Amino acid sequence: MGGWSALAKLLGKVQAYSPAGGKVWLSVLFIFRILLLGTAVESAWGDEQSAFRCNTQQPGCENVCYDKSFPISHVRFWVLQIIFVSVPTLLYLAHVFYVMRKEEKLNKKEEELKVAQTDGANVDMHLKQIEIKKFKYGIEEHGKVKMRGGLLRTYIISILFKSVFEVAFLLIQWYIYGFSLSAVYTCKREPCPHQVDCFLSRPTEKTIFIIFMLVVSLVSLALNIIELFYVFFKGVKDRVKGQSDPYHATTGPLSPSKDCGSPEYAYFNGCSSPTAPLSPMSPPGYKLVTGDRNNSSCRNYNKQASEQNWANYSAEQNRMGQAGSTISNSHAQPFDFPDDNQNSKKLAAGHELQPLAIVDQRPSSRASSRASSRPRPDDLEI
């Protein structure tokens, strides 16, 4: 049982990295094969050669008849079967250990690169390559190993080989022994002088164990087939799911389009707010405060808003009847767009704007014409 415990320990490690079907298969292997073979079956076949008797006194006849009837013992045959069907699983375990070793190396290298990154080194490309390698090996966060890529192929190959070995050993057992034991075996072989009859001990008990091991082999084969289909359809499902939404998995959701002409966009995205027009009651020397227009995305917006504000101000002056008034130099506001090389315009302080006059369509009376010819003290010189 010492050898069985070592094999069971190795297979127990595989169970931590196997899907549901693989865990069920390992449970069947442990309980109904290894445990049963190590306890009941060995005791049932313990006296198989010593209890094999033939009705002859010829020396060596019993040995050659036993060798003809049982080329290999059932117990040793089942031991070979368990070893062969476990080897692909152990190869998968070796691949898992290889991936875990790679994970340790990649994590160590990633920590070194992050330390270098804190010192100011540009290691973004190397970190991205490490992430790609982790995805290739199927390594996820918290040390979890996901079955994909080479690991998935190794697991599928192990299932195929286990199924092939199960079928092969069932066929070999059927060819050598059949699936039942007889109580009497007829033997005619040298050095037996004639045809002799040989008798087997406990044939019914041994037949029951043979049928039981046959059923366990069929169950294991069925579990392998189910697991193979499950892994295949799961891989197809994951691939279809990855192809159906590839953009959101890489770049994330799209951001809404931004209207640079809206005041909300100008405020929340770093654009300067449109310049308010001068009020008619603005004191002399009052200057408008403009924001920073280095943001190229809002330059056109600020320019159009400023022109519109001055047009609105002109209309307001005309409506209020302030004809002939001019805007003093102190009211002039420079508008500078330093980043616009082609369409840059600047209203320098000291440049007079054209007077905004209201056109009166009514005919002037004679009194008003005479009154208008007299100078008044509050008239402004132009």
Swiss-Prot record:
Disulfide bonds join 54-192, 187-198. Residues 362-374 have a biased composition (Low complexity). This is Gap junction alpha-1 protein. SUPFAM superfamilies: Connexin43 (SSF118220). The modification Phosphotyrosine is found at residue 247. Phosphorylation at Ser-325, Ser-328 and Ser-330 by CK1 modulates gap junction assembly. Phosphorylated at Ser-368 by PRKCG; phosphorylation induces disassembly of gap junction plaques and inhibition of gap junction activity. Phosphorylation at Ser-368 by PRKCD triggers its internalization into small vesicles leading to proteasome-mediated degradation. Sumoylated with SUMO1, SUMO2 and SUMO3, which may regulate the level of functional Cx43 gap junctions at the plasma membrane. May be desumoylated by SENP1 or SENP2. It is a multi-pass membrane protein. Belongs to the connexin family. Alpha-type (group II) subfamily. PROSITE patterns: CONNEXINS_1, CONNEXINS_2. Residues 317-382 are annotated as: Disordered. Residues 264-382 are annotated as: Interaction with UBQLN4. It is found in: Cell membrane; Cell junction, Gap junction; Endoplasmic reticulum. Keywords: Acetylation, Cell junction, Cell membrane, Disulfide bond, Endoplasmic reticulum, Gap junction, Isopeptide bond, Membrane, Phosphoprotein, S-nitrosylation, Transmembrane, Transmembrane helix, Ubl conjugation. It holds the Pfam family Connexin. The modification S-nitrosocysteine is found at residue 271. It comes from Canis lupus familiaris (Dog). The chain crosses the membrane at residues 24-44, 77-97, 156-176, 208-228. GO terms for molecular function: gap junction channel activity; gap junction hemi-channel activity; tubulin binding. InterPro entries: Alpha_helix_dom_sf, Connexin, Connexin43, Connexin43_C, Connexin_C, Connexin_CCC, Connexin_CS, Connexin_N. Residues 45-76, 177-207 are extracellular.
